[in-house]
């Protein structure tokens, strides 16, 4: 963290440390809880955090507070990101570099909530099917697609078979299974 008057320090990034950041670091100056419509995004990887979350953050900084962003970790490997974001009040720093090498740090505050599907898939389905959810977006890397060796959809993949077998209290575990469960609930 670049702290005002102290240079680089190892202070944790949290909502309470934002006022102590160096003025060169852009910080969210809006009510992070505000927003009556929401975007639920599955797959909160680096691409999402550097693009969609940044765009939503910039809109909110400009006073457009209608939209809030909920992130969803779908895979077990997303646990590390969930833990890191939880320790930082769902804040993170995005550093961009201009063609001339100038760096710009910005704390992104658009992520109002992070849900972790492996532990609470029903919370994810609740968010996806909520009336205030207007947009469901996702970024899935090639490893997240349920394909066979030829790149074709594989109805026999472990995740697809688990989703198809889900019944009653069982919740799907794949991104598409979660979206389908939410769509069925919204009917």
Residue ranges of model-derived segments:
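Non-transmembrane, aqueous-exposed alpha-helical and coiled segments at domain scale
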Residues: 5-187
């Amino acid at each position: 963290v670049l702290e005002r008057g102290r240079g680089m320090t190892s202070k944790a990034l949290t909502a309470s440390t934002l006022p102590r950041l160096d003025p060169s670091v852009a910080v969210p100056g809006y009510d992070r809880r505000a927003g009556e419509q929401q975007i639920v995004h599955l797959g909160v990887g680096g691409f999402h955090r550097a693009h969609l979350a940044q765009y939503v953050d910039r809109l909110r900084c400009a006073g457009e507070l209608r939209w809030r962003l909920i992130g969803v970790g779908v895979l077990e490997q997303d646990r590390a990101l969930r833990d890191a974001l939880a320790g930082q009040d769902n804040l993170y720093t995005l550093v961009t570099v201009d063609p001339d090498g100038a760096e710009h740090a910005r704390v992104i505050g658009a992520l109002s909530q992070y849900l972790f599907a492996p532990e609470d898939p029903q919370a994810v389905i609740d968010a996806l099917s909520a009336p205030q959810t207007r947009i469901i977006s996702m970024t899935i890397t090639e490893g997240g697609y349920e394909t066979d060796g030829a790149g074709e959809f594989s109805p026999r993949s472990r995740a697809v078979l688990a989703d198809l077998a889900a019944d009653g209290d069982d919740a799907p575990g794949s991104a598409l299974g979660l979206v389908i469960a939410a769509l069925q609930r919204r009917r």
